[in-house]
């Protein structure tokens, strides 16, 4: 999660920082002895009866541990609904011995993972007022059940009221559990239909000493972090009028699917994080319970291994997808560097973040009456004209001498050192801070407890020039205002993790983008801003829930295809989307995948790039998985073909070629989901120096022809190693524009000899 769990409430600053700093999670994990619980992956179930699956787990453990009683004491969880496996307390040597068992796919230690709106859906054009809109067609998502795996939920929030909702869908098989401060009969309703808290992994990892009362936690589904409540309301929050944060961003709050049902699975806890043994159990339960989509705003750092079973979200989501349940997960918040994207398994819908067309300008008035507009969430009263000083090498001495009392401090950059210094400035009684940055990141103001504004270097230099040419420079900081619409440019923020995929570069990640900057949503009884791919993920999850109502038989891959091929490459107003990093540039597929999600287009994509179990098995073969591992994962004997399939032919709604030498031909298959008699022709935007040749030149569909395979010959004119260049391939029938991104890197020299 990194620094992405940003709370725009300075009264919550200490708690917020405790939650977002990686070091806290890591130190807590070390303190609590991370390596006691091991997760034993067995792959697909060999029995349909959960009791028989559980029995098979004991049959594996008993010989290793010497008795049934020892096996019972060791066992933490049985995973028996969506897949087979268990979590058990094992020594390192026991885990090593168990990994050699013929039925065991892999044994991995349980780990700690990190948690990674009044305007969002208006911005995306998902409007409740239009009788032809997706919301009206789906009755606001009333039949959709969205499973959220996170830090719990604050049930009293008005975002979870069930006014106007009909009966709970009959297919629901889940539970609502009571606990400390949470009464299932009182707090669950026709909106919040499921609420569980998974604690066995937590308590075993903490040796039973997780002191939840002193940490302000509850052994219940209740959310004391705020994150789970926030994301659940983004996905499926009810209509709430007059929602705002201290007067900012006022309007009607609602989720993507306002009448959808929520099932919360709490696996994340204060000062510890999210325990993977519990997270896998939550995925297992969500498969059992009958959710339509699983939303996971949790992750780690960018992966460095091909192994699906080393990725708990990747492993659990594989089995969910095999059951037809889409899994939507966050790309992570450790951007903007390349190859930082998380949750990269090709069956996961991985979500990047963008900004909204909304900003919060802060008037900064200098003593010469020049007013400069900064940015930030400043809800403090106006700071009248007061002395303006520069944060430089003399600042520490000024703090010691009390010279910062009541002043506004100008600081160039806002790195970790400056934020620590800002806390010293705050403690020394300064009245406000102005940060000057090369690329504006207003979220840094959430780290200080005084009025704060952010400007770019140009404006920062203007302020500095005024200070250097004035005997007693002064400034005034006004509260933020809310500005919506043009001329605000949409952007992929610095924190959003970028591609290419670190373990399978031919698999484009992220897949899609959604708003994740300064998103207003529910927390404990109020509404607050948070930023991160955590906030973008439930926006997509809610839209996927709506899509599953309109197309209940579409596979998770078909849904991902519809999201990608209909996405905006610009913002909804037609303006370009920029990418923030060390420099600002136009966004490309490694920033936002297929683009910004377009909810009103996604139900009618025209063509889809579909995949099923055979496609995923071909991927595993191409990723050098051996037959035995794939057979265990699948639950039956499987042999990869010889030669193994090319990962370049994996039927994704994208073409990514990380090492092109000369030329290569790739294939894709599309299925017609539009009018039966349709003719599509290609529109090609070739990457720089790359030639794309498509065959056949037309795709002619009829009542008996619903699928067509085409090839794309990719040829480079470059004769040196290049970076990635980007283009697109669009099939159009004049109504539907089925567009996929094309990313190509030419590579003549190997990285090793």
Swiss-Prot record:
Q: Which residues form the Peptidase S8 domain?
A: 120-603
Enzyme class of the recorded protein, top EC level: hydrolase
Task: Using the record's annotation, list all stretches that form the Inhibitor I9 domain.
Answer: 38-115
The EC number(s) attached to this protein equal: 3.4.21.-
Respond yes or no to whether keyword Hydrolase is given for this record. yes
Intrachain disulfide bonds: none
Q: Which family does it belong to?
A: Belongs to the peptidase S8 family.
Catalytic residues, per the record, are: 150, 227, 534
Residues that carry a glycan = 97, 161, 369, 639, 704, 737
Under the cellular component aspect of Gene Ontology, which terms does the record hold? Answer: extracellular region
User: Which CDD domains does the UniProt entry name for this protein?
Assistant: PA_subtilisin_like, Peptidases_S8_3
Protein's UniProt name: Subtilisin-like protease SBT3.17
Question: Which residues constitute the signal peptide according to the record?
Answer: 1-29
